[in-house]
Amino acid sequence: MDRQCSERPYSCTPTGRVSSAVSQNSRISPPVSTSMKDSSCMKVHQDSARRDRWSHPTTILLHKSQSSQATLMLQEHRMFMGEAYSAATGFKMLQDMNSADPFHLKYIIKKIKNMAHGSPKLVMETIHDYFIDNPEISSRHKFRLFQTLEMVIGASDVLEETWEKTFTRLALENMTKATELEDIYQDAASNMLVAICRHSWRVVAQHLETELLTGVFPHRSLLYVMGVLSSSEELFSQEDKACWEEQLIQMAIKSVPFLSTDVWSKELLWTLTTPSWTQQEQSPEKAFLFTYYGLILQAEKNGATVRRHLQALLETSHQWPKQREGMALTLGLAATRHLDDVWAVLDQFGRSRPIRWSLPSSSPKNSEDLRWKWASSTILLAYGQVAAKARAHILPWVDNIVSRMVFYFHYSSWDETLKQSFLTATLMLMGAVSRSEGAHSYEFFQTSELLQCLMVLMEKEPQDTLCTRSRQQAMHIASSLCKLRPPIDLERKSQLLSTCFRSVFALPLLDALEKHTCLFLEPPNIQLWPVARERAGWTHQGWGPRAVLHCSEHLQSLYSRTMEALDFMLQSLIMQNPTADELHFLLSHLYIWLASEKAHERQRAVHSCMILLKFLNHNGYLDPKEDFKRIGQLVGILGMLCQDPDRATQRCSLEGASHLYQLLMCHKTGEALQAESQAPKELSQAHSDGAPLWNSRDQKATPLGPQEMAKNHIFQLCSFQVIKDIMQQLTLAELSDLIWTAIDGLGSTSPFRVQAASEMLLTAVQEHGAKLEIVSSMAQAIRLRLCSVHIPQAKEKTLHAITLLARSHTCELVATFLNISIPLDSHTFQLWRALGAGQPTSHLVLTTLLACLQERPLPTGASDSSPCPKEKTYLRLLAAMNMLHELQFAREFKQAVQEGYPKLFLALLTQMHYVLELNLPSEPQPKQQAQEAAVPSPQSCSTSLEALKSLLSTTGHWHDFAHLELQGSWELFTTIHTYPKGVGLLARAMVQNHCRQIPAVLRQLLPSLQSPQERERKVAILILTKFLYSPVLLEVLPKQAALTVLAQGLHDPSPEVRVLSLQGLSNILFHPDKGSLLQGQLRPLLDGFFQSSDQVIVCIMGTVSDTLHRLGAQGTGSQSLGVAISTRSFFNDERDGIRAAAMALFGDLVAAMADRELSGLRTQVHQSMVPLLLHLKDQCPAVATQAKFTFYRCAVLLRWRLLHTLFCTLAWERGLSARHFLWTCLMTRSQEEFSIHLSQALSYLHSHSCHIKTWVTLFIGHTICYHPQAVFQMLNAVDTNLLFRTFEHLRSDPEPSIREFATSQLSFLQKVSARPKQ
């Protein structure tokens, strides 16, 4: 034992004894006895003077006192005791590593690691002593000790030369030792050597070189160490790494003669092709050997030798991925010096039979062909490595390499292996080209085919998973291709953008993507080295939460880098052509994704858009003098996305809009914005993982600080204000694009987009609506989108935008809406109402529509001899007429219609005349056809006629409307021959009803008398001749002026106008003495009522009516009572024509005397009410019509209440409810009138007309219901019996309501009649 201890370097006796004691009895607990501690302390104290590893002072100061020295000795004693305890504890833990279970082993290793960080030298000494004291320990125990020693050496800051030599010798002795643990035992020993290299790699490298150049093929462990050293990035500094690589090259040069040694060459090839425990990962020894082989071939001067070795290598199996990568690396390294030879070998190998069989056109003949299945992948990787390693001479070869790669891509079996090989090779090729000087002076003609392969590859990527870097690699390659000459054509570039956007943006949500991706990822390979791991005591934790968490983190990183690759590609494209056209081209492919219905697609698209704008804003690549193209569309889309429900989309949209604002300001001022740091003028080359120049990580890493936020106030504004400020910087064309974008957004199915589009449209019109030039197409588009807007607030804002737009573009909007108003639907009508929401605009809309009515083309042969009208013009005219009709009912146009009544009134009458002109026959026709042609179709004249009716009714002139409606005079407006009579009746009604609009209409029609259009002059003279009877005429047109106007009419080209002017000149207004003459003719005319001829009587009654009209304000005087009495006597005449004429004359008399209070006439009116009421059911339609009209006129004279309701009832109501209302109006006036009316009704019970008898019976029935006593006091027995018989007869009436009423009245009558009279 003493001998052993004396031979140990820097070994201390106490530690040795403790080690011996522990080794002799493994069951002793870690704490040692007190005696042992004392003995150890003495030994340690004796040897402490010659040790340099202790940290306490070795010199005793002589001037210290005895007590100070005693204290120092006590401290040293405690320190030595602590070290001894630590050594003993470590020794015991090293011993327990042999039998510890996995969990205890993990605990021991952790404790030793902590000790090594505090005192690595002590731990190394303890482990060394343990090896010396226990030479027969098991291989598994040694394996664990090697691992521990590797950890301790790595934790040590300095490794002393003695320990370095000792552990180097220990490693070299065990690296080649064969044990039951196989390779993992050797690798553990080799890793010790690697750990020593951290402190002194040159010494280790010298050992390795010596072993490598012996002429005997080196052992696997030696290659393992060299492989680890070559692949590690942490062992060497940059300078040492270069030295190591240079030393490898020198080793390769010295190894060239070995290529001629058959045994060495075969051993090399066998080692390279022997399958490993796993082919998923390349072992360090194989990875180094492929590199070393390539360096040797690179150093070989004989090209034939190089070809022979490469051919032999390629003829081995290509089944495993790492094998293919290694072959490609060897070929690439050889190509650095032997490019022609390598190219020839690859070309020959590509044409060989195994390769041809591996293509899809030929199926494998047997299972051995499986080793050739992925040979195409090897070739692809080889071309990539050739380009990467021989980049100094590669430019002339690029097109050839690309053509070969494209060929193998298209004609090889498609799988993940081929795809990844193709991408890897292409990345290496693009890297070599980009790093080659003079690449920009070359033109590469195969880039478009390579780009097509990339697009095919991305389209084949599964759309629901993201497991690989294929997408980002393909986009990085595309970014590099964009820099080469010649530039990519627009069509291919468009395909590239569409493919990339679809492949990235259309990926599912991250949660769904994570779920799908984790299912596709391979679980940990628990079969890796199963026997060796089991023997070594290794464990596997399984596929648990940590693995899932790793999957999530991996996916997040993969997704982020994929998005960054897309952003980098967009930045590369804009850098190659930094123009506004190129920016618009790129953004135009983004718009479809910015408008996606899926939130995550919008979020991704707007993020890429924001990154691109931020890149341009911070680097100022675009020329400030160049105008943006269609930037308004981008502003509109970003503005809508600022209202996106997704918060991330909102933020990106707002930030993108802010950067866009700064770009616009830059272009406006003509000064490029500068980045915080100096902006590069070219995109920097992507690093190994392809990070873009400006990406989302940069955004997160450098957020806008408070100072920059304060400087760039735009980033502090809300989205509404940002978009509003941007609008201020847009040109007119850009504003139009923005508005068009907003209009398109109205048709979206996303509620938020519709709402945002309406707000933006309203804002744009509010701020800049007056500047817009052409709004017709915009208005049409709004109409198309309006039907799909179901959000009330959005529709309201859209219509409000139309209202604001109409302030400056009324005529254009009216013309546009006219073109889409046939047929008129609710959405178009809403637009018309929006036009009139402003009072000034509503007047202008009506004026514009009236101006449209002036375009009245006539067919050939019409009175104006105008050319044949175009169909479009006629439809426009019809639409204007229809809108004038519909807008009268719109609340927004109520005031405008009221104020524009005179113009509308004359225009509608003129339009009706025009429509009737269109329906005149153009040539002589048979009698029946002529009659049909003379009657216009309902569509031709109904619109203007209905518009006139609604004008009268909606503006408060319903009295005038009632006059024509109750007479059924609207039919007069349907033929050209009766049209003048209809206009005359309407004008007469206005005069009789004292219409307030007569002065205004007069002022409006006077200019029409001078119109070049005959129809306008005709309408004006028709109305003027009737207005001559109005008292207010002289307020507008003095008598002399009226005479002048009528005299001028005598010279009018139109015969009709001349006749009407002549009739006007004969008016009593100009001949006052004519009144007495006409009054004197009334008595003889009344005597003529008793002529024998019916026609004569009717004609005389008509003459009397005309005389009453011509007398005008003078009236008939006292003769009115006689006219009334004479006329009433014919109400019950058996002759229909005479009854009708009598009622008409009575009505004219009542109207003529309406302003005069004659008690006798009022009595006649009271007495005529029941007959008129009963004749409402007259069998003769003419009599019934005249009865209605006269009844209404009498009610007006008597000043009944609810006249409008009375008119509506007379005009349109039917049934018992109408009869009840008329009875109520008649019988509730006064007791005197009640008696008169009831007496008259009772007298009609004896009528020979069944209709009259039925009608009066119902009338009396209503009276009995409400005034039974008053009725029965006036009934005699005959009248009562007659009532019973009549009600009994009505019980069988065909009308159910009358039968029901008769039954109830009969029962009631029986009960009342049975009561005794009081």
Swiss-Prot record:
It holds the Pfam family HEAT_Maestro_2. Residues 12-38 have a biased composition (Polar residues). Keywords: Repeat. One of its GO terms (cellular component) is cytoplasm. Residues 1-38, 676-695 are annotated as: Disordered. Signal peptide: none annotated. It comes from the Eukaryota. SUPFAM superfamilies: ARM repeat. InterPro entries: ARM-like, ARM-type_fold, HEAT_Maestro, HEAT_MROH2B-like, Maestro-like_HEAT, Maestro_heat-like_prot. HEAT repeats lie at residues 581-618, 769-811, 840-880, 996-1033, 1037-1074, 1076-1113, 1118-1155, 1164-1200, 1278-1315. This is Maestro heat-like repeat family member 5.
